[in-house]
Amino acid sequence: EGMKPELVREYTALIKRIMEVSRKYQYGRTLELRQCFPFEYSKMPAVILKPAMVKEELYICEDFSKDKVITVSSYEEIGNYIKEGKADAGIGIIEEVGIGVSDELHNLLAEKDLYITQCKVQEDGGVRRKVVTFTDKLVVLPSHNRVKVMFECPNHSGSISSILSMISDYGVNLTEIHSRPFWKDNSWNYKFFVEMNANIDTKEIRALIYQLSQETAYLKILGSYACEGDF
């Protein structure tokens, strides 16, 4: 009482910051003591013999003989083929760097429980494309330096800034982020798709992902993979 409004704001911000740092420590200790990491993953590389692709994107295929690739008409079909065992992986363009991302492929990963396991950057006519391979199992290898996640965040002041601050507290850099609004419970909310420069199979990143799972409305891992460069 009697404090200047600007001092109240600064004091409140300081208290919030202390609480955030305290929660970070508590989540890390909880994970150590209870072994309660909420996601399972394999440490064995995926064996891919029957990849599937959208026919119009077959030209980007570099790692497989094109006559061995199953071609379909949509990403949804690729997802169905993987789930039915007709294909063991999908390949597609998830982003044209500096131009835009594929909403269809992001939706497929989020809704069909599919995971990026490889990422290559191709250049063609001055356009850089992120070409990803995805399977129905989350695989984490020591060489991986990227983690892609999707989380839901309510549309109120400070919600995303607190999440980004949390990620920063772990010393993690973001290499890509985009959002998409959706209608839920009579209000607009947001799905955020985030790529982080990190490896899941480390103590700090497991603690970060555990904290994200507790402090967002919903969290899903979309992949673990290696990607060269700053994109």
Model-derived features: positions:
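Domain-level signature for soluble enzymes in the chorismate/prephenate branch of the shikimate pathway
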Residues: 1-231
